[in-house]
Swiss-Prot record:
Coiled coil ranges: none
Annotated GO CC locations: cytoplasm
InterPro entries in the record: EF-hand-dom_pair, EF_Hand_1_Ca_BS, EF_hand_dom, Parvalbumin
Origin superkingdom: Eukaryota
Native source organism of the sequence: Callorhinchus milii (Ghost shark)
GO molecular function: calcium ion binding
Keyword flag Glycosyltransferase: no
Protein name: Parvalbumin alpha
Taxonomy of the source species: Eukaryota, Metazoa, Chordata, Craniata, Vertebrata
Protein function: In muscle, parvalbumin is thought to be involved in relaxation after contraction. It binds two calcium ions.
Alphabetized UniProt keyword annotations: Allergen, Calcium, Metal-binding, Muscle protein, Repeat
């Protein structure tokens, strides 16, 4: 499934523009700007599986680093700090990766 079947390409482009600068990424603001916060759990789960590029059932640190590129090719890589901050925010059980239920909760808490 394409991310643009779930979220507006215009909203994604606007949000990516907001976070172009290094260390400017705020996942709460990003999820709100792209409209993910308003989506139901099924749609949020579908986005999770798009972000889980290796289909492991988890979003690992290396996938988080390039998470913005999953929304649009012009997205940038997150800095190491941004990546760690996002992982810390979403990794409720401390296993170093974000599972689908953790991702749904991360979006809900944004």
């Amino acid at each position: 499934m394409s991310i643009n079947k779930i979220l507006s390409a215009a909203d994604i482009t606007k949000a990516l523009g907001e976070f172009k600068g290094a260390d400017s990424f705020d996942h709460k603001k990003f999820f709100h700007m792209i409209g993910l916060k308003k989506k139901n759990a099924k749609d949020v789960e579908a986005v999770f599986y798009i972000l889980d590029k290796d289909k492991s059932g988890f979003i690992e640190e290396d996938e988080l680093k390039s998470v913005l590129k999953c929304f649009a090719p012009e997205g940038r890589d997150l800095s190491e700090k941004e990546t760690k901050d996002l992982l810390t925010a979403g990794d409720e059980d401390g296993d170093g990766k974000i599972g689908v239920s953790e991702f749904i909760q991360l979006v809900a808490n944004s």
